[in-house]
Each structure stands twice: as C-alpha cells, then as structure tokens.
C-alpha cells in the first residue's frame, strides 16, 4: 500500500475523528470535520450499515493514519506487541506512543506528527546526547530529547511550543521549555493515552 498523499482533512472525515494532521488548523473553525461532519465522496452523507469487520477495519485505519504508518509498519508493531507480556492492544499503543516522532509531537516541538517526523529526519534533535534522525526509534523511560541549539530559532518550532498549552503534555513526559529539553519519565500505560481508540477491535481484526 502506497503512502497517502491526498488532502489530510479527507482522512479525518473518513474516520469521523480529528486526527490532528494539519497542526494548529485542526483547533480552529477551519477544520474540515467541523464544517462537514460526514465521510467524503458523493455518497458521504448517506447512511450505511457497517459490518463487524468494517468497524474493526475502520479502527485499524484510524490508528494507522493517526500515527502516519503504512500497513507493513503497523503490522510489525502489532506482531511485536503480541509477543510482549501483558495486553496486546495496550502494548501496541505504548509502542506507537514511544516512537521518537510521536514523542517530539507530544512534547510540543511540532504541531503535527508529520511535522515532527520531518524535524527528526532533518537532525534537529539529540537523544541521550546523540544525534537522532530515525523517527521510529523507541524512547525508553529516562531518555532525554533535546532540541539542538542551532534549531532553537526555527519559527515553526517556537510557534508549536507556544501552542502546546492547548493540547497539554502527557503525564509520562516532562518538558523544560527554557532548556528545550524533554524527558520520558516512564513508559506510557493505557491511562496515559487519551486519544479515543478501541484497540481491542484491532486485536480482533488481526486475530482472524
């Protein structure tokens, strides 16, 4: 499956949920989901009954799009979560939340996950004292993420940090705004992830 390059707002409408793919725009009245709260397409406003499989598939698609992953990547995370001790669905969400690009977004250095991914790839961050350019790196408890000094005047990053108060920072993370430093205090558990996700539906889908 190729990476989606169409309008981001169509994805939010398709999943009937704000995926925050457009950064600050998603918090304004310009959000497409607020203006047209129905799926895109000619028959978007029509009602249709969805099967159990359809409900499970939509949940998987929603989470994939939320974190910006392709099917092969997402399945790899699921298989890894399934091999871990504990509840598979909760393990899956914890792995996704601990991706470096997601942590950069959660700390407020970027207004969207796609922007965070680009910043990581361009080498704007240091993880535990070493330059990190791989968005999928797993952040562990005790890890520190520091914005490189030469990047601290980037307008987009400053604007994102100023706006982070709007969505808040998860309890498992800590931000020192003055030092441009983030800390992973612990590994995220289900209670730390406020995004409305029914992960059990994904487990049921992949268990067929």
UniProtKB/Swiss-Prot annotation:
Assembly behavior: Part of the 30S ribosomal subunit. Contacts protein S5. The interaction surface between S4 and S5 is involved in control of translational fidelity.
Name of the protein: Small ribosomal subunit protein uS4
InterPro entries hit by this protein: Ribosomal_uS4, Ribosomal_uS4_bac-type, Ribosomal_uS4_CS, Ribosomal_uS4_N, S4_RNA-bd, S4_RNA-bd_sf
GO molecular function: rRNA binding; structural constituent of ribosome
Species annotation: Trichlorobacter lovleyi (strain ATCC BAA-1151 / DSM 17278 / SZ) (Geobacter lovleyi)
Gene Ontology BP, a term: translation
Record's keyword annotation contains RNA-binding: yes
Domain S4 RNA-binding residue range list: 98-159
Physiological role: One of the primary rRNA binding proteins, it binds directly to 16S rRNA where it nucleates assembly of the body of the 30S subunit.
UniProt cross-references to SUPFAM superfamilies, sorted A to Z: Alpha-L RNA-binding motif (SSF55174)
């Amino acid at each position: 499956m190729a990476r989606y390059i169409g309008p981001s707002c169509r994805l939010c409408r398709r999943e009937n949920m704000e995926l925050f793919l457009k950064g600050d725009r998603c918090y304004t009245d310009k959000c497409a989901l607020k203006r047209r709260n129905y799926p895109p397409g000619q028959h978007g406003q029509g009602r249709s009954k969805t099967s159990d499989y359809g409900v499970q598939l939509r949940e998987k698609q929603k989470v994939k799009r939320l974190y910006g992953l392709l099917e092969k990547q997402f399945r790899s995370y699921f298989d890894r979560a399934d091999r871990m001790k504990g509840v598979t669905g909760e393990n899956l969400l914890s792995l996704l939340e601990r991706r470096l690009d997601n942590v950069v977004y959660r700390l407020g250095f970027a207004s969207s996950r796609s922007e965070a991914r680009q910043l990581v790839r361009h080498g704007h961050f240091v993880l535990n004292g070493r330059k990190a350019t791989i968005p999928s790196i797993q952040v562990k408890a005790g890890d520190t993420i520091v914005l490189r000094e030469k990047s601290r005047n980037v307008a987009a990053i400053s604007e994102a940090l100023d706006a982070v108060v709007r969505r808040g920072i998860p309890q498992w993370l800590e931000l020192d705004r003055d030092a441009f430093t983030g800390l992973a205090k612990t590994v995220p558990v289900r209670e730390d992830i406020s995004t409305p996700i029914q992960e059990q539906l994904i487990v049921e889908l992949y268990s067929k």
